[in-house]
């Protein structure tokens, strides 16, 4: 039985971590010491330095020649079973989601072995169980955390393809990612360009959107406006590329002469707006003089879009009746992609290639449309990702002369409606991407039914994922800490070589701070959220059930399958019932995949873990 001394040993490992968490919470919530930007910097320090050095410390101290392979096989089989079931659910169920697959895998299979496992199990079953926990940590750092990175990068690539090419993804034969792009996690602004080359197939290039910033600076040097301008579109705001973060709309300098000169044949930028779609009197503010720059011109057949803030829109106009074809031509689809499925309502270049029902034309740099409402953040992040891929519909109060503008997720057969598609711009709850709703004529439809079902060929996606995972791993300190740690342990335990004291103490200083800084980061996250239970009571209860019921149950099945019996079986089950690990929360915060659920699981999991594990210990000892 566990004694009072063993209980005190467990508490000495837990209390200091809670001190760090409460200190961080008070620094933001009560004393206002840290700003959100400073909190982000602390989180980066934890992910890049504290956690990798902590992993190296434990891996290097583990003897790889004395590992209990059967115990490790049971732990690995548990994770494989859970992951397989989640993949089947994601593939076969309408409610399946890759985000939830990653989160549920973390909740049910990645416990807090360092903080609770080692001291608690040493008190229950002796020192050998502590060594088993260290071996679990080794596998977590080398295999399972790397697998999580793979899943996160796959998620980013899948979102990028489905958002940028909802109708033409199946036609893509190659995807090239510039070497300066480290990850597809959505934290850096990207732009994609699709080009039909000599082979007649679609080739995609992904690059940083630095050109947009340079274009802004060049235009500001010419004294052009850099502020949002009010539009006569209800609940919509039109920004030019040089839009600033200032959320206060100011008067537009829209120039009627420039606008109508665009309708002259052979002049101005191409567009598919007909005269019947011109702006007539509306309830919104009237247009004012504009500083619109006419820099249209011929371009190679490309289709461009951006992942965050610049040009990630496709404009589609259904064919109106005849008689609209004598007006100014279609705009460059760097911003708009006119659909040619309608009648002769628009005039376009005859040599522009058509891919997936959309006419591809290039060189769109000038005008970009961002749609927002009062429910969105008051500050418009022009270039930053919105953190979600939510969509909404807005339409003007129309009469026969007004243009109906809709924002929705495109469907392959929706050729009769005019819409603008907005990617990765949050209009609602941004932490559940699988439940984003779009409206069409007042009827709510799930975006899962409107998203493109077709993805690029498996070989194209596999190559893209492997490239991005490799780039992430070679730039991720956790990869090097795990590799160097296992290499050093193989050498040191083979020939009894000790690490030089100068290096060992340097690593020890930062590795000792790893868990404390991870808890400090958790406290910062708590303080920046309005609620301690950030995910809500129902999700918190569900996370606790996954952690303390599902995880141990699957471990029991896996342990029996590999032949674990006796004390080893008890250790395996209690290890699976430990509270949620901190490292998965750090990753979830970095990639913005349900960090509220992971933080709640860590906080309240550590509070209730001790009585739950004691209950398991008593039941297993009967």
Curated annotation (Swiss-Prot):
Q: What are the protein's UniProt keywords?
A: Auxin signaling pathway, Cell membrane, Glycoprotein, Membrane, Phosphoprotein, Transmembrane, Transmembrane helix, Transport
Q: What superkingdom does the record give?
A: Eukaryota
Function, as annotated? Acts as a component of the auxin efflux carrier; this activity is enhanced when activated by D6PK-mediated phosphorylation. Binds auxins including indole-3-acetic acid (IAA), indole-3-butyric acid (IBA), indole-3-propionic acid (IPA) and 4-chloroindole-3-acetic acid (4-Cl-IAA). Seems to be involved in the basipetal auxin transport. Mediates the formation of auxin gradient which is required to ensure correct organogenesis.
Which GO cellular component does the record give, naming just one?
A: apical plasma membrane
Task: Show which residues sit on the Cytoplasmic side of the membrane.
Answer: 28-44, 92-100, 153-482, 528-541, 588-601
Residues that coordinate or bind (indol-3-yl)acetate: 51, 112, 114, 145, 582-583
Q: What is the effect of changing residue 472 to A?
A: Impaired auxin (e.g. IAA) efflux carrier activity
Oligomeric and partner information = Homodimer. Interacts with TOPP4. Interacts with FYPP1 and FYPP3. Component of a complex made of PINs (e.g. PIN1 and PIN2), MAB4/MELs (e.g. NPY1/MAB4 and NPY5/MEL1) and AGC kinases (e.g. D6PK and PID) at the plasma membrane. Binds directly to NPY5/MEL1.
Q: Does the keyword Transmembrane apply?
A: yes
Q: Where in the cell is it found?
A: Cell membrane
Q: What is this protein called?
A: Auxin efflux carrier component 1
